[in-house]
Amino acid sequence: MSSCLTRPATLRDAKSVAEIHLGAAHPAGTAASAVLPPRALGFDRQQVFWREAIEYGEPQIYVACDADTVVGFVGFDRCRDKGSPPSMGEIWSIYVLPAYWDRGFGLALWDAARDGLLEEGCTDVSVWLPLANERAMRFHQLAGFKREMASARTVPVDSVRVEEIRLKRKL
């Protein structure tokens, strides 16, 4: 079994976070790869985006490491949904490299995000997920999230439209 360490991301992690975001978001052969196109932002722009997120703390980024290798990350902060109360947090993104799935890294990232949101005074948390991403749905439901059926919506992602739904839970 691998040793899993989570820690706040540093600027040096921006490249790894960008690589994970581009690679883990669309692993070949998954339902997500069938509905989600490759990210419109190229790698260089992804790296700049994540470097700025890490530098300015919006969202807060934690990474999961196997020894010295960054294998996953979570971005979390206050909820961005219009009209949400200040006590509502949000998982903005959570990704683990496919080679590290089912080894506890996703759970460790969720634990780090939950602890961070509690420190910020949040009492609830939400996450938006593509309906077709059965693996992510299952992960979040096992972590105690419940679907909000009335929240289902279609959003543009690159050149396609993706059906997504919000899940929530108490912290």
Q: Where are the regions a protein language model picked out?
A:
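Terminal substrate-recognition subdomain of acyl/acetyltransferases
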Residues: 2, 161-171
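Acetyl-CoA-dependent GNAT
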Residues: 4, 8-14, 18-99, 107-112, ...
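Active-site acidic-Proline motif in GNAT/NAT acetyltransferases
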Residues: 97-99, 103, 131-132
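Short glycine-rich hinge loops at helix-strand junctions in the catalytic core
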Residues: 104, 121, 144
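Conserved GNAT acetyl-CoA-binding A-motif
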Residues: 117-129
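Conserved catalytic-core motifs of GNAT/GCN5-like acyltransferases
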Residues: 126-129, 141, 146-163
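Helix-turn-helix
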Residues: 136
